[in-house]
UniProtKB/Swiss-Prot annotation:
SUPFAM superfamilies: Protein kinase-like (PK-like). Its EC number is 2.7.1.-. This is Probable ketoamine kinase lp_1983. The active site is at residue 189. It catalyses: N(6)-(D-ribulosyl)-L-lysine + ATP = N(6)-(3-O-phospho-D-ribulosyl)-L-lysine + ADP + H(+); N-(D-ribulosyl)-cadaverine + ATP = N-(3-O-phospho-D-ribulosyl)-cadaverine + ADP + H(+); N(6)-(D-erythrulosyl)-L-lysine + ATP = N(6)-(3-O-phospho-D-erythrulosyl)-L-lysine + ADP + H(+); N-(D-erythrulosyl)-cadaverine + ATP = N-(3-O-phospho-D-erythrulosyl)-cadaverine + ADP + H(+). Keywords: ATP-binding, Kinase, Nucleotide-binding, Transferase. Ketoamine kinase that phosphorylates ketoamines, such as erythruloselysine, erythrulosecadaverine, ribuloselysine and ribulosecadaverine, on the third carbon of the sugar moiety to generate ketoamine 3-phosphate. Has higher activity on free lysine (erythruloselysine and ribuloselysine), than on ribuloselysine and erythruloselysine residues on glycated proteins. Disulfide bonds: none annotated. ATP binds at residues 87-89. The keyword Nucleotide-binding applies. GO terms for molecular function: ATP binding; kinase activity; phosphotransferase activity, alcohol group as acceptor; protein-ribulosamine 3-kinase activity. PANTHER family: FRUCTOSAMINE 3 KINASE-RELATED PROTEIN, PROTEIN-RIBULOSAMINE 3-KINASE.
Amino acid sequence: MHLTKTWLAQLPLTDIQQVQPVSGGDINAAFQIITRHHQYFLKVQPHNDVTFFDHEVAGLRLLGAVTKTPRVIASGTIATDGYLLLDWLATGTGSQSALGAAVAKVHHQHHAQFGLDHDFTAGKLPKINHWQTDWATFYTQQRLDVLVNLAKEHHLWSETREMHYHRLRQQLLQDSHMHTVKPSLLHGDLWSGNYLFDTTGTPVLIDPDVFYGDREMDLAMTTIFGGFDTDFYQAYQAAYPVAPGMQDRLPSYQLYYLLAHLNLFGETYGPAVDRILMQY
């Protein structure tokens, strides 16, 4: 995507000196903007209005109340494109222990119910966040079922997968009384690409997809693609111990993220989905 001078002139910035594309995202166009006195990170969603970024802004503010996140400068619409303007953060190195403590601090933020005060349906994977008092109901109906139905639409589902998924779903609902869950604020997409360390070594959480749910969902995501080491888990456990049996529950939460990748990237993730489904 090319940003014209006319487009850039509508940003709430003065004296823009340089604009550099930034790689790494597959959803938004991203740029580093350098002015005379400051640097900014700009996300642009082509042909999508400002509401596309409302969910991310809300998430950054919720997380930012208890841990470091990029500061939101502005969001809006230019021409037909939604944009989100953030502070540019120079990166450094930091400790996994500090990251684990930061995530635990986020999870200590609780709510009376599971969900969020708004849905997010502008992306490729709809997030239905209607409030629920029962976690198993929320997770099966508003997370897993949504992605399974999407996989069916994408012709990525089979009778075998449906049979095993039905068994998993029933077990989650039947066994919900065995696992007491307190609604925690979740990052929602906690993989290694969504944290960094600033130049002081402070952990920074980015690109959130927040809601209130079982904190083991965030922890499950950390186990799928790597990027979190023993120090992270030890620091997390010291700050907010997990309930016994978490290792047995993690696959059912890993399934959500693997279903997301199945829908986004296709059958490459099918074997990983099947490995979990076949346990039921």
